[in-house]
Amino acid sequence: MSELSHTVYFHGLPGSGGELALFDDVPYGKLAHMFVPIRDSSRTQSDCTAYMDSITRQIEARFPEGPIHLIGFSLGAFVAIHIATLLKNRVERIDLVSAAAPLEMGDFLKEMAGRIVFQAAQSSPFLFSLMVKWQSWAARLFPNMLFKAIFANTAGQDRELAATPAFQKGMAKILNDSLGRNAHIYQSEIAFYVSGWATSLAKVKQPVTLWQGQADNWTPPAMADALQQALPHLCSRRDLMGLSHYSTLRHFLGEYANSAGEKA
């Protein structure tokens, strides 16, 4: 991570920039410099290209010059890949953490905890819309209930995380921000994600590092396998035994914070 590079973080879905402050053992002060673009689909409607262009313009306005380091967590990897192809040689490197691969690249859904959401988005936009409305209602009025529903089948070290009050409180706020107040963004971006984007991977010319928890049942290891085969400039893959989705993010952010501390 170059001292001169600007860092851009793409959160998961549901998610927000609050992910950077989720973990008590990762000092947020070492991460606070990261730029988290606003992912607002209200003006781009169902146009994925316009949506990605709007995010790219935010980054260019924030960082007119200098190399850029992209970090994509979970479904944020989908956005990071697209932005990398638009920013081109401005991007110095990419870290994909618990990355969601294109669904058309494998039989992943049967291994994914959130399969019902993606199946609805693929097969029935109407049903998906109803599902998002229910999630939005629950996030605003009963965030703890929604948290328990989403984290009912956690695996690996995510089980320990999900049992901690600090993580529960942080995720409840994230769910309210993402689903309660910005459900339209969540709905639009998942619709973009399931529409097929595997061809974008071959356009990524920057070095990529994959961070994959081997116990992840949100974005299973098979997704990292597919990305490894498709990305032309994969420079490293970090397989983390016993870690699942958010525990892999915690591990990555901890390493990033330690590296930032060494450079300070």
Predicted region positions:
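Alpha/beta-hydrolase
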Residues: 114, 135-199
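Catalytic histidine-centered segment of alpha/beta-hydrolase-like enzymes
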Residues: 218, 237-254
